Amino acid sequence: MGKNVVVLGTQWGDEGKGKVVDLLTESAATVVRFQGGHNAGHTLVIDGEKTVLHLIPSGVLRADKTCVIGNGVVLSPEALMDEIRELEAKGVPVRERLRLSPACPLILPYHVRLDQAREKARGIAKIGTTGRGIGPAYEDKVARRGLRLGDMLHRERFASKLGEVLDYHNFVLTQYHHEAPVDFQRVLDEAMEIAEELRPMVCDTVSLVHDTRKAGENILFEGAQGSLLDIDHGTYPYVTSSNTTAGGTATGSGVGPLYLDYVLGITKAYTTRVGSGPFPTELFDEFGRHLAEKGHEFGATTGRARRCGWFDAVALRHAVQINSVSGLCLTKLDVLDGLENIRVCIGYRSKDGETIDTPVDSEGYEVIEPLYQDLPGWSESTLGVKRIEDLPNNARAYISFLEEQTGVPIDIISTGPDRNETIVLRNPFLD
């Protein structure tokens, strides 16, 4: 019988999921995206060539792999076609490998306009969204007024629904935000043109996933963003609009939770965050600048500089709990090379000296300070190391300490951006 493995981020996103998914896809028949939208940015480096994916599962670069965009993904038809064409220009036969759920909620131009208008109105209190319409599209889904990919395949149905929802959103845009309205005919014409290109890729993805499982094939479920951005369990309201945790796998793909065999949590050897929101271990000194520069910490989707800080074991323990993480993959270990001392946050303390657990909302983070334990660094390079025995002693001690703090084994260690620069202690599909 095949295995179903979930790969997701356990921090605030940007943990290096794309590389790990690409690596593990060698052992999978199918790769499934189950939430998020084109606000994600998964960077792959294969033989020195860099590819950034936003919607299409990272397994697309491997031959004979089926890639599925499940019903939990909010889909921008325009962004998807741009990504397909970009990959095809590199010689990747995307259309024969990609399958799309007809239940995907659509991101249309008015969602983007609303997203950007809201962020503008918030001023300094902005959430820090990518401005790509993700939140408004999920809102329409929950409000039961959203258009779905299946609607695009039927012109009259799509036009009727579009007219109704556009009246509503144009009222908000013009009367509340004082912005120009979105043109109905332009949205309709653009959608219908793309619909014919997407039609051959649309299918019953729930049955496809279950048929793959019944055939004894391995399936990899690829998460986007990170667990601490989860709409329910993250640092609310500085979160994304979907469930980025393991529970979202079932609702976003149609696979039952009892069929999930292993959850691999991806975490950097330090911590980063893009945009606004709590970040207890954030650094504003030369160490923070070192991590940002050596780690090339700029968002793959927005290009925004990432905030950097020490490893937060408290936050990771929380992520382990809410995901039932089976094992961890530690990425960007090489960024810590050359540091004399490395700090790990092992607890939170309130201003009155009380040790506390993870706050449930962003306000709770305003009254805590991190408790650190200092560990010795290493001067040797870990870049490209492929065996655990070849790592510096202090690097191995650091890895062991993180395992002790989180209570979860570190099964994979990434020592560089290329898929080959990896130490695999346990392959979720094979061991």
Curated annotation (Swiss-Prot):
The keyword Manganese does not apply. Pathway: Purine metabolism; AMP biosynthesis via de novo pathway; AMP from IMP: step 1/2. Its cofactor is Mg(2+). The active site is at 14 (proton acceptor), 42 (proton donor). GO terms for cellular component: cytoplasm. GTP binds at residues 13-19, 41-43, 306, 332-334, 414-416. Its EC number is 6.3.4.4. GO terms for molecular function: adenylosuccinate synthase activity; GTP binding; magnesium ion binding. PROSITE patterns: ADENYLOSUCCIN_SYN_1 (PS01266), ADENYLOSUCCIN_SYN_2 (PS00513). It catalyses: IMP + L-aspartate + GTP = N(6)-(1,2-dicarboxyethyl)-AMP + GDP + phosphate + 2 H(+). InterPro entries: Adenylosuccin_syn_GTP-bd, Adenylosuccin_syn_Lys_AS, Adenylosuccinate_synth_dom1, Adenylosuccinate_synth_dom2, Adenylosuccinate_synth_dom3, Adenylosuccinate_synthetase, P-loop_NTPase. Binds 1 Mg(2+) ion per subunit. Belongs to the adenylosuccinate synthetase family. Plays an important role in the de novo pathway of purine nucleotide biosynthesis. Catalyzes the first committed step in the biosynthesis of AMP from IMP. This is Adenylosuccinate synthetase.
